[in-house]
Amino acid sequence: MSAKEFPTTDYSKITQKYYFEYVAKRIIKIAKLQNTNKTILDFGCGQKIFSRLLKNYEIINYDIKPEYTEFESYENLHFDIVIFNHVLMYLYPSEIEKLLDKIKKLNPNCEMVLGISRQNIINRIAMILSFNPLAHKGIRSTYKEQVEIFFKKTKLIEKKSNILAMTDIFYSRFCS
């Protein structure tokens, strides 16, 4: 699957805008991002929702799609917090492990926020009702795989489950 084929949230569509802005606002609240002077890496930034919601904060936007990214690579950047919002599901489990290892090597003290699709029947119904049948095209890892890998490498700071029964949010940092 090429970079162009991965789905991107379209904030011009009212159902996607409402839901994903709500998830982004919950991420901001859980990780207390509205009160930070830390540099935030929005990994898989898409249409840069966090830059819009957190004006006047230092947000680094990185995406596999050239039209969205501000940097060719995240590997030479300095950041304190990484947001993975509905992103890891497009990586194979081995790629998630490698990514987290790279992030830890770059900053072993960074915090991470994971917004993760529960990939359940409610998500599928929402895809249909929002006229977005390709929303989960290209998924390479299950909810369970993502959570297992994430918590093998990190420890939980805070969790918010069940955002409309479709998304879980985990705020964590690397294990020692």
Task: Give the predicted meaning of each segment.
Residues 1-39, 43-74, 91, 113-176:
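Class I (Rossmann-like) S-adenosyl-L-methionine-dependent methyltransferase catalytic domain
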Residues 83:
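A conserved beta-strand element that flanks and buttresses the S-adenosyl-L-methionine
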Residues 86-90:
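Short catalytic micro-motifs in class I SAM-dependent methyltransferases
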Residues 92-96:
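Short N-terminal helix/helix-N-cap motif within the alpha/beta-hydrolase-1
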Residues 97-110:
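A short glycine-rich, Lys/Arg-flanked "PGG" loop and its adjoining helix->strand segment in the class I
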